[in-house]
């Protein structure tokens, strides 16, 4: 089965006897991809001590830094799921717990190379990436939208819920049926558009409630809580997808943690 370092830095030792100490060194590097791939950062040759430290710095900023969030989200998942099981009328606790669980699945993709299940080659890279980075992200959006509605103690309109559920099934099918990363990238663009439709419904709910005196306080609290997530998501969209920056970590993950804590 194939594997990749994902968001971690690649560090290779080159035998000194194979290097030209007094001139240029030209290397041929083959990148094996499933549909699409590239070298994501600048390549340099240096002493092993510096290269090793630099690789560790890049790996920490783009991969290992996310590990610290998993424990908190898993605790939140267990706590709020337990509350829901004792009080099943409060649907918001179930939505919030599932939102945390799906977020954990998404974050796992950032440090997959440190997971025994992945490094032992039990799961092919494409399948792991489909489930963790893509499907878990789609599920997180679905449950977040549900939470924005159930937070006010209201039951979601059955027709709207069925429409969102159908959209979710379509998104999961598109991701699961992608045969390589090129097709997966195309499918994910379509899924993001469908996610926006689902999320708009959830976001509009607190905005509508802010005009109702009895719900205004909860609406303001919810809007304040999600403000860091919205700002960090917009920053990542500009920084990652427009400017193409590869060094800074995904700030939306940090913004999402602030939202969960609030």
Predicted regions and their residues:
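First transmembrane helix
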Residues: 55-87, 188-212
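Hydrophobic H-region at the start of alpha-helical membrane spans
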Residues: 70-74, 97, 166, 223
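Juxtamembrane interface at the cytosolic side of transmembrane helices
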Residues: 76-105
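An acidic-aromatic loop/edge-strand motif
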Residues: 4-71
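Interfacial "cap-and-anchor" motif at the non-cytosolic start of specific transmembrane alpha-helices
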Residues: 104-262
